């Protein structure tokens, strides 16, 4: 009697295992180090120790890259986790909170209220969370809400619950990447925080954004002057260009989130991470009108609200602290936000501050990635060379001049270059070619000439070949730094610098400082720099975090 039952159980276990393997292969591969704000959040969160997280963070991409949990831990000892995802609607925040509270008992849940204005999140952004949520009651309710809001879809609820059925056609586009793990099987060292190491200045001020919003709010009438042959007509009708009204459905879910927090003894803190853009072209631009609206709603609901954009005593430099022209903050801005928010939390909430060995190890990995990002973000010549001296003395540094690299150098600049180990007479360098190679803090090669220069050698643990070329203004103004045949140089006027991590076999930065002028303007290719930082973080995640 037991044998048939035992046999059936074996077949069931085998069937479930095959189902799970196929599902893992077919689900799109997402990696937290690719700057996709909506990947790896729940999967990494599930791997945290039970009841270890004191602060949960939810919201859209503004808070995903604007609040860094490891900054909170480093400075204040606060253990937090960032569950914010791209275009995260308030419904998604609610169901993620339901799921998070199954394994954690946080003291505070932070919600970035920008998502109160999201009413049309597409299928893609819901799926990012659904795919990673564990099977259970919360996922069932979440999938049910998902189906209600996407009535135009022909997917059944069970197809939403099980990604294998949803992504079954992906077998047509399988690649090697599909056979790697879909999500993290260990803790996320960054606790869901996203580091961005590029700069794209905003083209407007907060004052101008609010001025535009005020004008848009006043313009509620549409007119049309039309000629059809000899006939002329004028029509006027009500038509709002801009509104700060919040959909009723979003208010309803905001209340449900409040009730969920109350039922679980969690303090709900509404915040807003700064976001700057023209309100008519970017719906998430955080105008003062939106701040006033949300502030009033929070007062009526009895929810604590801290608007970091309009209430905090900090100054965002919109020329340096954003990576996409204003909407999102880079590491510079995120560190300011995290420091301010950490101070607010410690002053207003009774939070534990206890050392944790595992978190300390995660912090070390975070600091490694942050150091690379800070190097890539640095625009000041003196500060950058100091970073090379103090933080990169275990790296290889390749330097090639293009056009002219000495006209703008002053005594302070030359002294700092001397500390780096460079010895040429820079007073003789005007319009000339120049090459330097520094390895582990020692200058291996340095040359200055009024003719073009070529130099090659071998680098790294695998003894790969590097090739360097420099030509000054008299000889065609070019620079090249190739590592293993791959070009990394910016090739702009001045000192072109490439920094290579020997132990990890990775280039970590490529920059040019225009030392022909006194301003030493830095030049970087943002897409290349993003790629370098991502490869470094990938190494941290896939190699060092697995040791």
Predicted feature descriptions by range:
Residues 284-363:
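C-terminal regions of proteins
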Residues 374-396, 400-547:
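Short acidic-hydrophobic catalytic motif
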Residues 3-24:
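Hydrophobic membrane-insertion alpha-helices, especially the h-region
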Residues 129-264, 353-373:
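Secreted/periplasmic serine-hydrolase-like ester/acetyl group-modifying domain
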Residues 58, 62-148:
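Membrane-embedded segments
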